[in-house]
């Protein structure tokens, strides 16, 4: 699939970063789904999570971009080789590459030169499970509890349905319009479907206004599969954001 416009833009600035490598954010990933999820991070690897289990991912210092997601219905042998019905990453438990569609993605760009983290939930490769991301910061400039908790799989248009999830139209049809290739692109009927289900998530590549979120550098994050974070900061941020609207 395509990538959000802001990631391409911010990543271009990262080329110019020089000097000391800065600590990347830590991500605490928790599975609240009533089934096992094989969490994945690139960079970061992978881990099997039963319901209620967590995994802390700390990318190497200097890491500028990454993706985190959940895999479903996986089977791995003792060497960590196998397959997943959704979110598979080259048949390995310890991910060393991107996910196979359909998959619900958390994407981040860490840019210390701007003193900002950029993060989002992307449905550009489709949807396989609900999730949320919550920054663990009380900084008022850190606005962005993002959720995509709709049961998209049960609502998925028949032509996009596959085992384990719901494909995006870009992955399914690979056309310029659906994949937002070229100088200008607009919503399609399919991207509107995803946006209606998850208003805070990317539904097409230039969906930046309502889908790109920032926090000051130094912020860590909680990602929850099938639920919201119950962290105290979630309530604080919700109150802060709504009081300022």
UniProtKB/Swiss-Prot annotation:
Instruction: Note the Pfam families from the entry.
Output: Thaumatin
One Gene Ontology term from the biological process aspect of the record: response to arachidonate
Cysteines joined through disulfide linkages: 33-226, 74-84, 89-95, 142-215, 148-198, 156-166, 170-179, 180-185
Q: What induces it?
A: Strongly induced by arachidonic acid.
Q: Where is the signal peptide?
A: 1-19
Where does the UniProt entry place glycosylation sites? 90, 186
Q: In which tissues is it expressed?
A: Mostly expressed in strobili, and, to a lower extent, in roots of seedlings and saplings.
Entries under InterPro entries matching the protein: Osmotin/thaumatin-like_sf, Thaumatin
Keyword annotations of the record: Allergen, Disulfide bond, Glycoprotein, Pathogenesis-related protein, Plant defense, Signal, Stress response
| Keyword Electron transport annotated | no
The text of the family note is: Belongs to the thaumatin family.
What is the purpose of this protein? May be involved in disease resistance.
What is the name listed in the Swiss-Prot or TrEMBL entry for this protein?
A: Pathogenesis-related thaumatin-like protein 3.6
Q: Which organism is it from?
A: Cryptomeria japonica (Japanese cedar)
């Amino acid at each position: 699939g395509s990538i959000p416009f802001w990631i391409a833009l911010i990543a271009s600035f990262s080329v110019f970063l020089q000097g000391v490598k800065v600590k990347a954010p830590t991500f605490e990933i928790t599975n609240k789904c009533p089934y096992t999820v094989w969490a994945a991070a690139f960079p970061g690897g992978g881990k099997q999570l039963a319901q209620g289990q967590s995994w802390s991912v700390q990318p190497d210092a200097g890491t500028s971009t990454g993706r985190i997601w959940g895999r479903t219905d996986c089977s791995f042998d003792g060497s960590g080789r196998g397959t997943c019905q959704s979110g598979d990453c080259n048949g390995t438990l310890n991910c060393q590459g991107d996910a196979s569609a359909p998959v619900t993605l958390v994407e981040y760009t860490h840019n210390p030169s701007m003193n900002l983290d950029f993060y989002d939930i992307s449905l550009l490769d489709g949807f396989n499970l609900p999730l949320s991301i919550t920054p663990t910061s009380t900084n008022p400039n850190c606005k962005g509890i993002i959720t995509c908790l709709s049961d998209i799989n049960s609502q998925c248009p028949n032509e996009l349905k596959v085992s384990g999830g719901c494909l995006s139209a870009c992955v399914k049809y690979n056309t310029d319009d659906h994949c937002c290739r070229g100088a200008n692109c607009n919503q399609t009927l399919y991207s509107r479907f995803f946006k209606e289900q998850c208003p805070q998530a990317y539904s097409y590549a230039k969906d930046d206004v309502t889908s790109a979120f920032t926090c000051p550098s130094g912020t860590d994050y909680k990602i929850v599969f099938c639920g919201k974070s119950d962290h105290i900061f979630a309530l604080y941020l919700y109150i802060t954001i709504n009081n300022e609207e």
